[in-house]
Amino acid sequence: MGTSSYIYAIGKRTLAAIVCALTLLGCDSVIYDGEGDCSVNYRVKFRYDMNLKFADAFAREVESVTLYLLDGGGRVVWQRTESGEALGKEGYAMEVDVAPGTYDLLAWCGSTDKGSFRIPESASRKELTCTLMRESGTDGTGHIREDHDRLYHGYLPNQTFGDTEGIYTYVVPLVKNTNNVRVVLQQTSGERLDKKRFSFRIPAENGRMDWDNQLLPDEPVTYHAWHKQSATAGTALPDLPDAVTSVNAVIAELTTARLMVRDKSATVRSETGTNPPQLQPEELPEERKMRLTVRDNDTGKTVLSIPLVDYALLVKGEYRRDMDEQEFLDRMDEYNIVCVLGEGMRWVSMSINIHSWKMVWQNTGI
């Protein structure tokens, strides 16, 4: 090999080595992440542990996710909806394709088979509200007579989407906005109860939610029992022929939207015991607050009428975790209420069960 050819070969190898070294320096973090190139990847995960078990139930409960990325002016710069089996797989994350910057992450999630909620298509954050579909009554109120989809809301503000190569992962916490209320009426006399005899309802004003999950002004909405059944349980006792050995009951199920502290009775809210208690700005007037009502259709009389939020919060003291009242309501999603009826279908006692906790009240007015 001539001198010129030797110098050319050495120069070519040196140039290749320099290019290779520059490439390694530019992609060292990517190699660390195992990507093999200089790309930037954004991934968003979702977590639903705002429950009384303090365990992430996202994979088990959530079937559909719609994610919005919002810029500093509240404009939607990117959105995507994903649903199906992929959400239930371990490690699920939504891939996000957006320019580097700072964004707020907003999510509406849940099940979608019933079409219970409507979220408008919009490029503005303030219009990404959620409305519970309802029947319109002739009196200007709404009625929900069927079970509805589960609904979850998530918000993660002011997140930086970096421009340095690598994988960026963000986790959006979710709050569940739907609650199941199961009511059991029991008869002490052993008389069989007909499910058609009783009406169950919960009037409320919680059918519209803003982008930040706060309630918007709404028409009165009445939740009706979407399932009722008569049931009997008991055992025959030959040695006690006159004893009541069976329990007859009517079981009803209702589903409501988000429970809020604003529906707590003012008399309970007042800490000073002043009379009358001062109404807070966020509160509703007493006559418009959420109540569970059971009516005897045969007589037209009200069997039971209780402030649902008040009774739910009575159980809060049983839990040994520090949380405010709204967090407690958000963590609850199922209420089991048992009402024992005596003579004349008047309630004798009532209990509310939440997980393993039980509170019992006696009707001292009978």
Residue ranges and their predicted role:
Residues T23-G26:
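C-terminal motif of bacterial Sec signal peptides marking the signal peptidase cleavage site
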Residues A55-E61, G190-K196:
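A short beta-turn/strand-edge loop motif at beta-sheet boundaries
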Residues D28-Y32:
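Bacterial signal peptide processing site
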Residues V65-I119, D194-Y319:
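Tryptophan-paired
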Residues D33-L52, P173-Q186:
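A short, Gly/Thr-enriched small/hydrophobic beta-strand-prone motif that recurs across taxa
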Residues C130-V175, I306-I366:
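Extracellular beta-sheet/turn segments enriched in Thr/Pro/Gly and aliphatic residues
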Residues G2-L15:
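Bacterial N-terminal signal peptides that target proteins for export
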Residues W78-N177:
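Short, low-hydrophobicity acidic/polar segments
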